């Protein structure tokens, strides 16, 4: 793409590029973000044009934004949420009335699962990390906590939901699409999620 990307200093220079929240294996997305440092200013639409001219099939850069100096790393550390659309594959839809069950499940005061860590397993209440949840045609939409502080996988939510419904899913019963990644610009008392794109601005 011939972008003037900046490199780190030292014996093993590398491009100053990082992803906001790496996508899990087997999950597709329409809302991924990465941060790169350029050695010189460029128009944001030109960045998009150059990247898409050399992009691999199946991937497209939708927009580019300039984040003021000193705030790029902060922007990445602000990652706090993500939207996911879980859709059951054809013939894999369980006998669950999603329109009825999903709101009741989301209204539960506590949702405990056995969560595996590197050293052990422990009972964890994941309800505080489920920000929103709605039934969709042949699936479930959810907004979950994402980031370094608390990172909840949609697979765990579906596992807990189906167990609560008394249903056991076969392997590869659904697909997962991540639609958006958010930053939290609120306070400790009140969460305020905005798309990462909103942290920057276009350069013309």
Regions found by a protein language model. Give the residues of each.
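Short, charge-patterned binding micro-sites
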Residues: 6-39
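Short beta-strand-to-loop capping motifs
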Residues: 36-42, 86-92, 142-146
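Core RNA-modification/binding signature centered on pseudouridine synthases
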Residues: 103-204
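Ordered, amphipathic secondary-structure segments that act as subunit-interaction surfaces
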Residues: 30-85
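A short, aromatic/hydrophobic, helix- or strand-capping loop or linear motif
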Residues: 5-12, 61-67, 111-119, 170-173
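Short amphipathic beta-strand starts and helix->beta connectors
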Residues: 14-23, 64-73, 119-135
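Short amphipathic alpha-helices in soluble, non-transmembrane regions
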Residues: 44-55, 96-107, 157-158
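Extended, positively charged loop/linker patches that create polyanion-binding surfaces
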Residues: 71-73, 80-120
